[in-house]
Amino acid sequence: MLGRITTHALSARRLRRAHTGAMLVAVGALAAASTIFLGGCETPEKVTREVDPDVQIPPGEHGLRKLSREEYPDLAAAYKARDDKFAKAIDISAQWFMTGTSRQNYSSEQMGPISQVVAGHDQAAASVYAFRELAAKSSDAKAFQDAVYEQFDIWQTRGKDGKGKSLITGYCSPELKASMTATEIFKYPLYRRPADLVTDSVTGEPLGRRAADGSIVPWPSRKELLASNQLAGSELIWLSSAFEVYVCEVNGSAKLIMPDNTVKYVGYAGKTGRPYIGLGVSLKDSGVITTRERNLSSIRRLYERDSALVQQYIDKNENMVFFGMYDGKSWPAGSLGVPVTDHASVATDKKIFPRGLVMMFDTKVADYAGRQNQFNQFMMDQDTGGAIRAAGRADIYMGVGAAAEILAGNQFADGTFYYFVLKPEFMAKYPLPTSAKTTPANIVRGTPAAAPNAKGASAPAAANLTQVPAPPLAQPPASTPAPAPAPK
């Protein structure tokens, strides 16, 4: 369950190619990731934001438009850029489509306007299985593209302008120092999921708090909840500042280093469902910081200079996030309840985009120095987030720790993205495993879902998939720092 911190989407292979010998994995916790631009670095390409990327789709509509054959994008560059991370991510989606959670999410009760794009679970599952087979078995890029053009409908995001233009950001999982007990240094807790938090049994969306008389009532705001002392006794783990607590809440997951150097993993376990207001946005809109300062390093330095000022803007966010302990194998998990893969998993608004499908991005991504590079790559829609709530937004998962944070902090570019949906007449060509088919025997109704995911959206129950270790990120040079990402 991941939150909102930004990173770029080069695969490890392409990253190494783009920065041969120059990048070294950044070490240390998020707290140590304060970075600045050096004088010799190129200025990142400016993004023109004449249209609000968070413009909302009208109720009852999805976020895609079906392309005519003449509008289909070229697939050659993305086909050639496939790597082991994409292979891992598409395998995870294929496995997810064999679970009861996927059938619940693609049930007629849950799909809403997405049913206008994908008829149901079996078509969505077949889309992933077919794409995986074609990517693996096609003799070359032309053969692959010809097959996809024939067998798939391609849908493009409506974007922020109705024509596909979108803001492409990124996020990652922070690494912080923490303690299992309160100390003079560690005195700011993350909280466990309260017993009286009520969520939808299928979607995991919060419904409210169970009152003593059995009724369901709204939760108070985050500020009111903390001031009321209602959560006393449900502390899970302790951090060194209120700002780091907020960073964890926004991201929904973290790798925590204990005083004895052992490692704990925390992940999203629920939220109150109150309105989410991003800290970076609040500070910028109020004129406290500039657009360029809307990154984690700058906001952290501001907090260190004037914690009371930053706390005022933290308090504008009414939503409260709760946490649970995770093992390293299942962490970090996205809104599908399965592990996300750095440089291959994407977060989108699941109310208007379909879960688990193959996507293709046409955008620019930033390197460690903030330079923009053309980027065309297949990825998997496997997550969502509190700040990613529009057709004009997508967030690429960049991994864990300071190296990912640097890339995330630099990723802020216009672009577009596409979804691939297998045409119904080709479904028989790609038979699903029995366990992946929608039948009365394998539809599980009413199974409690995991609470909404880290970033604030609903996370279904985990599918118990083992995360295969991904290749390490190429490391950024110590002499080429860049802003770390900001909570959006």
Describe the function of each predicted region:
Residues F37-G40:
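C-terminal motif of bacterial Sec signal peptides marking the signal peptidase cleavage site
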Residues G3-I5, T99, D362-D367:
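Short regulatory "switch" loops immediately downstream of catalytic or recognition motifs
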Residues E42-T48:
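Bacterial lipoprotein signal-peptidase II cleavage site
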Residues R17, A22-L30:
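Small-residue packing motifs within transmembrane alpha-helices
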Residues V55-D327, W331-V338, K488:
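Secretory/export targeting leaders with adjacent low-complexity proregions
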Residues E42, G328-P477, P483-K488:
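C-terminal soluble interaction/assembly domains
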Residues M1-A18:
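N-terminal secretory signal peptides that target proteins for export/translocation
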